[in-house]
Design a protein with these regions (language model features):
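Non-ligating segments of multi-cofactor redox enzymes
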Residues: 1-191
Length: 191
């Protein structure tokens, strides 16, 4: 008997579309905030990780690439990556990068620094991305878009690297949003 597909089984299309749209117009990066707020709202409201388990388009995309395209060796992820130390350390690092992006956006808003049309891959490599922005928005709006897209693209690259080395959804083990929603769920159930 085959598995019945639901509408939410195709949310990976939105993730792929989001990543593709950022190549053509960086302002679409603002849509990525949905992937930030929806898991937080769902975890706070329901006290479950249902977003991660059922609705996360990125996890679905990694599953598609790893399983359907057979690009994953399906090895277990090392225990040190699953450890609380690594997960919370990675969350702290990711949060620091997010705050750095917000500070850069604020500095562009206050005209303290110039707006940069680059995407930072793996928080290290600034890649020119000028073709994806033709103007029309306040510089700080575009700066936030470049920064947020950098975070989303970097996390996608990390997810693809880990699916090529381990199981398809290995990224989910150390995903910062997954760690935050897990903390929210624990806090909610302790009340």
């Amino acid at each position: 008997m085959s598995k019945r597909n639901h509408w939410y089984d195709y949310l990976w299309v939105l993730t792929a579309l989001y990543l593709a749209l950022g190549f053509f117009n960086i302002l679409f990066a603002w849509l990525g905030l949905l992937c930030f707020f929806i898991p937080l709202i769902m975890a706070s409201t329901f006290g479950t990780k249902s977003y991660c388990n059922k609705y996360c388009g990125r996890g679905q995309l990694f599953e598609l690439i790893g399983n359907s395209w057979k690009l994953s060796p399906k090895r277990d992820i090392p225990s040190w990556i699953r450890s609380h130390t690594f997960r919370y350390g990675f969350l702290l690092f990711f949060t620091t990068m997010f705050v750095n992006m917000l500070v850069s956006t604020y500095l562009v808003f206050t005209h303290a620094i110039y707006f940069h049309k680059t995407v930072s891959l793996l928080w290290t490599f600034d890649v020119p991305w000028h073709w994806a922005y033709s103007g029309g928005a306040q510089p700080w709006v575009a700066q936030f878009a470049f920064g947020f897209y950098s975070i989303m693209l970097t996390s996608s690259i990390l997810g693809i690297i880990t699916l090529l080395l381990f199981k398809p959804r290995s990224w989910c083990v150390y995903c910062p949003m997954g760690t935050i929603t897990q903390l929210i769920c624990r806090w909610k159930h302790r009340k």
